């Protein structure tokens, strides 16, 4: 169980991805390999990636970081640079990302 008091300085990031039609399986495969690596990054409280049941080319990310520094460090990891920046992003038709803080 998460101690929610630890999240007072936390950062929640949600993202919505839509893969190009011919790239859905490739994106899903990349994300399956990426998620366990991201879950083990320092400062990650939660990191889940979901694929739509109704529209398989759509993906939803729910990420909780202990602070902004942890989020920035996550984006600098070798697995983020290789798998997300280097492989997945070019296979997307759409990408949206939103950041939230605990109130």
Short names for language-model regions:
Residues 1-9, 49-57, 84-103:
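Glycine-rich beta-strand-turn "strand-cap" elements at beta-sheet edges
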Residues 15, 77-81, 103:
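Short flexible/disordered coil segments
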Residues 39-45, 64-98:
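An amphipathic, aromatic/His-enriched active-site/gating alpha helix that lines ligand/cofactor pockets
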Residues 19-21, 67, 101-103:
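Non-catalytic surface loops within mature trypsin-like serine protease
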Residues 2, 6, 25, 74-78:
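Residues at secondary-structure transition points
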Residues 11-18, 48-75:
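Short, well-ordered beta-strand segments in beta-rich or mixed alpha/beta enzyme
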Residues 15-42, 48-50:
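Short, contiguous, helix-prone interaction/anchoring segments in small proteins
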């Amino acid at each position: 169980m998460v101690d929610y008091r630890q999240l007072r300085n936390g950062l929640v990031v949600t993202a919505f991805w839509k893969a190009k039609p011919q790239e859905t399986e490739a994106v899903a495969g990349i994300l399956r390999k990426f998620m366990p690596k991201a879950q083990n990054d320092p400062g990650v409280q939660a990191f889940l990636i979901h694929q739509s049941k109704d529209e398989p080319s759509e993906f939803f990310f729910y990420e909780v970081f202990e602070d902004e520094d942890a989020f920035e460090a996550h984006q600098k990891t070798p697995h983020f640079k290789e798998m997300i920046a280097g492989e997945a992003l070019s296979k997307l038709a759409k990408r949206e990302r939103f950041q939230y803080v605990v109130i």
